[in-house]
């Protein structure tokens, strides 16, 4: 899929992140749960899906006809990057034919010993037609990844690295700066409410991913329980 076609499909809509990790209530070794989440999202009018693991992506593709942002979360201790962190994950995701592959593009030390620029270059050389989304935490990381060759940047990791601000809302400042610089941006991270989603789109971002506020019952219930307890 070409970049312009993808952006046209997801523009001004909601891409729903459908993920569950081992230890979470909706995770199943047998699979079959995330496709139902994706189906519900599609019925609601979602314009895309973000999914983790080859299994979930393939299962979702069978029942939902929406573009997918694919990732593979795999730990490589002691290094911190775990979202599509090496070429092994890239190869696995390309084989699924997912429309976009998202990868950690932070400035943190990587398991493979490459700089993020070297990693992006190696991906583009091996898979020149694959769309890439850079999961970043700061403006500098976003700008660097975009200049290195990714198609879109995401604010996915803002608040989750030592270099980024800790807050319980979207990084509006980062989003505004990226839009000002005309860097294609997919907003993601701590978008908890429809009001916040509207504010994010008012900034002028190209697309938006929402996960926890829609597909993580534990987070949703916790937010309500915490709110009524604050009397």
UniProtKB/Swiss-Prot annotation:
GO terms for biological process: carbohydrate metabolic process; N-acetylmannosamine catabolic process; N-acetylneuraminate catabolic process. It is an enzyme of class 5 (isomerase). Pfam families: NanE (PF04131). GO terms for molecular function: N-acylglucosamine-6-phosphate 2-epimerase activity. GO terms for cellular component: cytosol. It comes from the Bacteria. Its EC number is 5.1.3.9. It catalyses: an N-acyl-D-glucosamine 6-phosphate = an N-acyl-D-mannosamine 6-phosphate. Keywords: Carbohydrate metabolism, Isomerase. Belongs to the NanE family. Converts N-acetylmannosamine-6-phosphate (ManNAc-6-P) to N-acetylglucosamine-6-phosphate (GlcNAc-6-P). This is Putative N-acetylmannosamine-6-phosphate 2-epimerase.
